[in-house]
Design a protein with these regions (language model features):
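Small cysteine-rich, disulfide-bonded extracellular modules of the LU/uPAR three-finger superfamily
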Residues: 1-108, 115-149
Length: 149
């Protein structure tokens, strides 16, 4: 019997830097592909729907579940990906976004979206708190890998 299945996994690397560019903190965290994200991936096989284009951070602490369609407590507005992103190498897609002075607080969640507001969320994760001041920058590099399970 043939058993076909596809596995999608994501990992994000977070780097927090101070005003002088010194690294204050780094994290590596797994994420959850949400239901809307799985549907988005399937739709891309037959349509030319919108591309993932934005990332958001927030202060939500509830663990991600497949039915999530937004962050629990988004900080500020979603930002577009850094120049040159996303990139693709084989079955790996990497997204990167930088959050500057307009984003402060105790950051505990992040997500990838296909629009500046509303739209489809691809994935969401929560993590241990990171205190971000107005002079700090936070860069999140998020790699999504699709493989045969």
């Amino acid at each position: 019997m043939i058993n076909d299945s596809i596995k999608v996994k994501g990992n994000l690397d977070i780097v927090l830097k101070d005003a002088d560019g010194n690294v204050k903190e780094t994290r590596s965290v797994r994420n959850l592909l949400v239901d809307d994200g799985a549907e988005y991936i399937a739709s891309r096989m037959i349509t030319n729907s919108g591309l993932m284009s934005h990332m958001a951070i927030g202060e939500g602490t509830t663990s991600p579940v497949a039915g999530n369609d937004a962050l629990e407590n988004q900080d500020g507005t979603r930002v577009t990906f850094d120049n040159g992103f996303p990139t693709r190498s084989g079955a790996e897609i990497t997204y990167s976004a930088t959050f500057g002075s307009g984003y402060t607080g105790t950051i505990t969640e992040s997500g990838i979206f296909d629009a500046a507001t509303n739209g489809t969320m691809l994935c969401r994760t929560t993590f241990n708190p990171i205190s971000k001041s107005s002079v700090d920058t936070m860069q999140i590099s998020w790699t999504v890998t699709i493989s045969a399970a």
